[in-house]
């Protein structure tokens, strides 16, 4: 778990259940795009109603998991054993992209060797950065599947997906399983 407390970055990922609407939000609005992993739990803002957040911190993927209507607190899942919850889906990341898994969470020491969007796109190495993608591909994870979202198509009006480039703003998954900004 070395490197957990350095090179923080938010990753646009979803934990979802069919029929529900989840939200990705900036977990620390005072430090746009960043989060302090040393804090174990955080009270859900009243405007968020216990929805789900997934973040990446340094070389490890940490998920803050909360089920809408079940809890008002998110708990850090810092290891495989710490993240086996009967009613949760968790996210696991590999060097070649996102993978959705049932009731399991993993961290990898070999991921995030560069800017996350470059890593997902073609494996280039670069300094760590909160990268606001332009013509890079994001992955929308829902219902245990991964759908590629081509941001350049969205910009040209050729895609049904919508994407808010400012990761510091709220991103929601609407009931039709596409990105929408709130």
Model-derived segments and spans:
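Short, compositionally biased
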Residues: 1-127
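An exposed tryptophan-centered "aromatic clamp" motif
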Residues: 101-131, 135-182
């Amino acid at each position: 778990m070395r490197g957990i407390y350095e090179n923080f970055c938010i990753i646009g990922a979803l934990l979802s259940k069919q029929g529900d609407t989840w939200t990705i939000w900036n977990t620390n609005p005072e430090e746009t795009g960043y989060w302090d992993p040393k804090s174990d739990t955080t009270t859900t803002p009243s405007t968020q109603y216990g929805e789900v957040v997934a973040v990446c911190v340094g070389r490890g993927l940490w998920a803050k998991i909360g089920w809408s209507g079940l809890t008002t607190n998110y708990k850090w899942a810092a290891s495989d054993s710490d993240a086996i919850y009967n009613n949760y889906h968790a996210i696991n990341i590999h060097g070649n992209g996102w993978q959705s898994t049932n009731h399991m969470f993993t961290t990898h020491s070999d991921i995030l060797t560069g800017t996350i969007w470059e890593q997902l796109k073609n494996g280039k190495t670069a300094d760590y950065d909160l990268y606001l993608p332009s013509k890079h591909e994001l992955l929308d994870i829902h219902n245990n599947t991964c759908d590629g979202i081509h941001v350049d198509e969205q910009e040209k009006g050729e895609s049904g997906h919508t994407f808010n480039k400012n990761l510091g703003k709220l991103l929601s998954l609407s009931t039709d399983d596409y990105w929408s900004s709130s």
